């Protein structure tokens, strides 16, 4: 029997990375919010790798932080090793990666959720979305509790009709032995949503006391590394850093896999879901890359106070006895004991082209989806969708302007645009290569790109916004100073001889004339820190300010070129397409284009052009049609204005009062 258990402004279903960001954003925007999760002990669970960040992913985390989200701050508190990746490459692809203590991460996020005003955390399994008149009205739990709200966000991760597979064994289960969400999957189908089926997996966890670290190569973190959060500044240098360890598969490893492929659900046809291309299982790697003699395997700590180690690169669904044989074939793991066995997990997802760029579903107003339910993989991708869904659900309740981030503004925009415009046939993972304007979308300038928008919405304020405003002012002031300061100094504080010697020491060409510091800094061999040695830079400039200044100066030409490309992109994005447009009336469109456009219903000409099957010729036809429609509407409006009744003619009313 159903009963009304509570009324809220926004309800979030699922307490993973997407759900936490969504619920926090909604509550921080003043909406009374309910977060329902299968187990409050598993809030912000990290069921797979104990790490945050990496190429593309660190950009998302910085953007979440710039919007006022929690993942960056929580990662900084829970980090046990931090490294900057791709330091030998340009700033567009440099990426921060943090090894985290899983328990610290979970506990920190749960404390934040429980301490957030206007946010209630409750344990329950949701089985039904209440839909009335095409709008979401709330949810119903397995026990019949009805929670009502005009906005619902579903962030169920990999739990929708999930099934775990190990060798020949399979059973209904979510990650880490949790319940699967079977009823909710059926309810989404009943509400007309198209669902697909994906697969992912996780490697075994092993006991560190059974490892021989002398046979592996240590991988240490960076000593002076920034944190993910702009608000918190640099990580505390007192935080403990622990090593990860590198080993490799062997010929024996590959032999064991090939001998047991007939016991792998991946190759026996038991697994039906599509797996992630960029995170394949070890058996898949050995088969697909048969010419490779070995594959890297990283042994990573799961926390400071546990003996569990994560074996990155060994995701598998092979039987348990085979998993042990595999691991014991690796150098350093000859006597290893497994604490938790690896497994594959199949789950349903909602085809994401059924969503608007706000992450609201097109079929049911007030219903938002975020995270792996939309076909993505990864904690960071989930959290990024979560904060956008949380903001937009709150804004819809408050009748505020929605937040739509374009692919020219953020990796979050790239992620969401790819999902809602192109869809995905495999678990979607973000990469820097997916962003056309990546030089403008660096991880170091996420705050300069997004924090002002978050401040206008009301998500960023106080010390966080003050720090951002100060950084912005300091960057501008330092850019202006470097542009007006000349060396050799006309006042003689830095002589010509000093400058030439300084340049020679750095292998840089001598000056033939006085030169602005900004020109000097454009030279690839000159760094901002070098200017301090010359006595022409402020040694107290914060590292984040110095990095931003250096990047803006060194890559000014490329950034300007990309800005011109962005301007063209935004021009097409500004050409809006009426929501009621009947594409069957647009003569000249190919049949495929008309079908795809009607199915996805893009909001702009720019988005239409990114739909698979829509050609440049189709876009040209669409532009002509939209222009003709605009002119007809203008003429119609003008005609109506010309026939408005006038007071002089007495047509506005002839009553005598």
Curated annotation (Swiss-Prot):
Its cofactor is FAD. Signal peptide: none annotated. Transmembrane segments: none annotated. Keywords: Cytoplasm, FAD, Flavoprotein, NAD, tRNA processing. NAD(+) binds at residues 275-289. One of its GO terms (cellular component) is cytosol. It is found in: Cytoplasm. PROSITE patterns: GIDA_1 (PS01280), GIDA_2 (PS01281). GO terms for molecular function: flavin adenine dinucleotide binding. Residues 632-657 are annotated as: Disordered. FAD binds at residues 14-19. Gene3D superfamilies: FAD/NAD(P)-binding domain, GidA associated domain, C-terminal subdomain, tRNA uridine 5-carboxymethylaminomethyl modification enzyme MnmG/GidA. It comes from the Bacteria. One of its GO terms (biological process) is tRNA wobble uridine modification. Residues 632-650 have a biased composition (Basic and acidic residues). InterPro entries: FAD/NAD-bd_sf, GIDA_C_N, MnmG, MnmG-rel, MnmG-rel_CS, MnmG_C, MnmG_C_subdom, MnmG_C_subdom_sf. Homodimer. Heterotetramer of two MnmE and two MnmG subunits. Belongs to the MnmG family. PANTHER family: GLUCOSE INHIBITED DIVISION PROTEIN A (PTHR11806), PROTEIN MTO1 HOMOLOG, MITOCHONDRIAL (PTHR11806:SF0). NAD-binding protein involved in the addition of a carboxymethylaminomethyl (cmnm) group at the wobble position (U34) of certain tRNAs, forming tRNA-cmnm(5)s(2)U34. This is tRNA uridine 5-carboxymethylaminomethyl modification enzyme MnmG.
């Amino acid at each position: 029997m159903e009963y009304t258990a509570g009324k809220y402004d926004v309800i979030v279903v699922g307490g993973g990375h997407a759900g936490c960001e969504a619920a926090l954003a909604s509550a921080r925007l003043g909406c009374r919010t309910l977060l329902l999760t299968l187990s409050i002990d598993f809030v912000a669970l990290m069921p797979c790798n104990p790490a945050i960040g990496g190429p593309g992913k660190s950009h998302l985390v910085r953007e979440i932080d710039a919007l006022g989200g929690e993942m960056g701050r929580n990662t900084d508190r829970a980090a046990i090793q931090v490294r900057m990746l791709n330091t030998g490459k340009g700033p567009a692809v440099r990426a921060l990666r943090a090894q985290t203590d899983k328990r610290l991460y979970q506990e920190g996020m749960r404390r934040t959720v429980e301490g957030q005003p206007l946010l209630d955390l409750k344990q329950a399994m949701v089985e039904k979305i209440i839909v009335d008149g095409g709008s979401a009205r709330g949810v119903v739990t397995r026990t019949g509790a009805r929670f009502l709200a005009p906005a619902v966000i579903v962030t169920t991760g990999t739990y929708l009709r999930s099934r775990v597979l190990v060798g020949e064994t399979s059973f209904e289960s979510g990650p880490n032995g949790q319940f699967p969400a079977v009823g909710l999957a059926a309810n989404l189908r009943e509400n007309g949503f198209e669902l697909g089926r994906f697969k992912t997996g996780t490697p075994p966890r092993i006991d560190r006391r059974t490892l021989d670290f002398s046979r592996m190569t240590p991988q240490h973190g960076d000593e002076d590394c920034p944190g993910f959060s702009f608000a918190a500044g640099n990580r505390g240098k007192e935080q403990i850093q622990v090593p990860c360890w590198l080993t490799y598969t062997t010929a024996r490893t590959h032999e064991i896999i090939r001998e047991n492929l007939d016991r792998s659900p991946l190759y026996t046809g038991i697994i039906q879901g599509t797996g992630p291309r960029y995170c394949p299982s070890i058996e898949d790697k050995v088969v697909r890359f048969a010419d490779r003699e070995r594959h890297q395997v990283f042994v990573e700590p799961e926390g400071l106070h546990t003996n569990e180690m994560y074996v990155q690169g060994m995701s598998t669904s092979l039987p348990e006895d085979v998993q042990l044989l595999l691991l014991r074939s690796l150098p350093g793991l000859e006597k290893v004991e497994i604490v938790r066995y690896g497994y594959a997990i199949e789950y349903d997802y909602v085809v994401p082209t059924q969503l608007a760029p706000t992450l609201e579903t097109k079929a049911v107003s007030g219903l938002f989806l975020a995270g792996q339910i939309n076909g993505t993989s990864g904690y960071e991708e989930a959290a990024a969708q979560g904060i956008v869904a949380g903001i937009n659900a709150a804004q819809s309740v408050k009748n505020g302007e929605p937040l739509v981030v374009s692919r020219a503004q953020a990796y979050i925009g790239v992620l969401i645009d790819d999902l809602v415009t192109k869809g995905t046939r495999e678990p979607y993972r973000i990469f820097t290569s997916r962003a056309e304007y990546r030089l403008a979308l660096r991880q170091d300038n996420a705050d300069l790109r997004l924090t002002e928008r978050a401040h206008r919405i009301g998500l960023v304020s106080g010390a966080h916004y003050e720090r951002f405003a100060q950084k912005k002012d300091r960057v501008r002031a330092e850019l202006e100073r470097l542009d007006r300061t000349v060396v050799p100094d006309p006042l003689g504080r830095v002589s010509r001889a000093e400058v030439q010697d300084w340049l020679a020491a750095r292998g840089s060409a001598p000056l033939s004339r006085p030169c602005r510091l900004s020109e000097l800094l454009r030279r690839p061999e000159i760094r901002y820190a070098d200017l301090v040695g010359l006595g022409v830079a402020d040694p107290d400039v914060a590292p984040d300010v110095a990095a931003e200044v250096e990047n803006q100066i060194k890559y000014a030409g490329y950034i300007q070129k990309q800005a011109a490309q962005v301007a063209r992109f935004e021009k097409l994005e500004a050409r809006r397409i009426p929501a009621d447009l009947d594409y069957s009336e647009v003569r000249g469109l190919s049949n495929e284009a008309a079908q795809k456009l009607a199915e996805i219903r893009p909001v702009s000409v720019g988005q239409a052009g990114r739909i698979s099957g829509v050609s440049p010729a189709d876009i040209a036809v669409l532009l002509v049609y939209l222009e003709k429609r605009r002119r007809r509407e203008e003429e119609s409006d003008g005609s109506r204005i010309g026939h408005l009744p006038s007071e002089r003619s007495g047509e506005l009313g002839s009553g005598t009062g």
